């Protein structure tokens, strides 16, 4: 089972790497682009939301990326403009940048084990 310390360690590594190398967004996924429109936010605002992730926002992970095999994915949730947003991020083993795979409205209520 993942503990608070594991989530904190991941977030520290993720934010440090994001600060140095940046982040790649999977904007080729339609629901990620659509979420920006529905939330009426500019793409760069996602970075602010992701930078503000804390342990209490943790939903699940690490989940193995069996599709692309880039590493482990971690899922978080955050309220943006009073709407719950599903955020899936990862530290890639293959490229220096961090990756935001999903940033879209939650399709169902998220469960936060540390809240």
Where are these predicted regions, by residue range?
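Functional cores of ribonucleases/endoribonucleases
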Residues: 55-95
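Compact soluble domain cores
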Residues: 2-70
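Enriched for short, Lys/Arg-rich terminal
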Residues: 90-115
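Charged, low-complexity, helix/coiled-coil-prone segments
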Residues: 29-33, 89, 110
């Amino acid at each position: 089972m993942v503990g608070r310390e594991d989530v904190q360690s991941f977030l520290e590594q993720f934010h440090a790497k994001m600060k140095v190398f940046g982040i790649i967004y999977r904007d080729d996924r339609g629901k990620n682009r659509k979420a920006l429109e529905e939330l009426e936010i500019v793409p760069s605002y996602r970075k602010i939301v992701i930078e503000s992730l804390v342990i209490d926002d943790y939903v699940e992970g690490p989940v193995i990326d069996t599709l692309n095999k880039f590493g482990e994915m971690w899922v978080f949730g955050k309220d943006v403009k009073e709407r719950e947003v599903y955020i899936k991020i990862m530290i890639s083993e293959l490229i220096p940048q961090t990756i935001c795979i999903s940033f879209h409205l939650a399709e169902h209520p998220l469960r936060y084990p540390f809240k």
